[in-house]
Amino acid sequence: MKVIQEKLPASQVGLEIEVPADVTQKAYDDTVRKLARTVNLPGFRKGKVPKQILIQRLGPNRIKASVLEDLIDDSLKAAIAQENIEALGNFQLKSSFDDLISAYKPGEASSFKAAVDVPATVTLNSYKGLSFKAEKSEYDPADLDEFLTQKQRELATLVPVEDRAAQMGDVAIADYEGRYVNDAGEEEEDIIPGTQAEDFSLDLEEGKFIPGFVDGFVGMKPEETKKFTVTFPEDYGNEEMAGKQVSFTVTLKELKSRELPELDDEFASEATNEEFETLAAWQESLEAQLKENAEISTKNSVRRYLLEQLAANNSTELPEVSVNEEITAVLTQQMMEFSRMGIDVNRIFTKDMIPKLRETARPEAEQRLSNSLILTEIAKVEKIEIDTDKFNERLEEAKAELQEGFDEERLQEAIKEELTIDATLDWLEEQSEIEFVPAGTLEAEEAEAANGEE
């Protein structure tokens, strides 16, 4: 069998296959015999239809189409084996099937073109001695104080306020309704859907609801009704309301202040369900946790910007079949996260939405797959090995989590890949020159750049 290979983009190989004349004749004869045995035609017993009657009744094109379906599939498999091609997934027929039917003649050579996905290719250009910036998170004692204050607020007693006006930090119980303000500055008659509530509890704090809404309550007294206008942000989730002026009519029905519990051992015990008996022990644990969080945040930042450098300096060609598998993995992970949050995934992952969700997940899937392939290739080149004790420990943890119903061989491979990538990232960090900047610096620069592009 004559086969011409052509390298195609997206990790594909193009094949032009010429099927010998004797093979096309045999395929035709085999198909006609098969149809004669299986086709039901009026006036004939099954399996007893004469060849010419069969061709006449079914039509030559229908028979040739049936021949070509098997011929293309069999010839492609033979060509892949002959050329030692490591094909992934199904093939794509590049020739027009209708043209092949028209050109096909039993006993004459027949040619067609197809493409198959092959394993991804990785081109390593530069990965040692990378230079980049990353954000360094530092433990700030103020974070501990803020956490404890928030816990005090959560366990605070709400005390009715009657002798003063509302101020920031209070809790307002109110009725409200919103109406659009037209270009003439007049309030429209209809209430906007979703902007009406009764006995709504609102914390009078900065950042609650939309800008200006909380401020409108400051200075009000219980039983007072007031109108004020706010402008919804341009990036508000409801596009119909984004950037619009809305007049709110609010009635403050109750006003409450928070009476914070004392910051003492009793409070620590209550806030932690008796996990800690003393405030000092709880503070020590919280401090250690916050310090660990800062280290993890720093490490995540280093790896994020390291991966960006690897992606910029090295390249991959990804087969579509692998990308689709990774898209499925991304969506499966999202479904599990939503499920853990108590969200009904069936309302999000509907039949109509899945194609859109898959397209949205594609960039992340391609980046994840590319990163993994680059790191795996670096590990091979640099002969990076994983720690056996760490592998065994992680394997036992995974078995305990899964308990039963898992393929141990696949589990071992997954853990080995995970630890290899982790070890490779650690090795690359040691090889890199990293300039640390305060946390939030780079993200602020990126946000500013993104706004500039808009």
Swiss-Prot record:
It is found in: Cytoplasm. GO terms for biological process: 'de novo' cotranslational protein folding; cell division; chaperone-mediated protein folding; protein transport; protein unfolding. Coiled coil: none annotated. It catalyses: [protein]-peptidylproline (omega=180) = [protein]-peptidylproline (omega=0). Disulfide bonds: none annotated. Its EC number is 5.2.1.8. Keywords: Cell cycle, Cell division, Chaperone, Cytoplasm, Isomerase, Rotamase. Pfam families: FKBP_C, Trigger_C, Trigger_N. Gene3D superfamilies: 3.10.50.40, Trigger factor ribosome-binding domain, Trigger factor, C-terminal domain. Belongs to the FKBP-type PPIase family. Tig subfamily. This is Trigger factor.
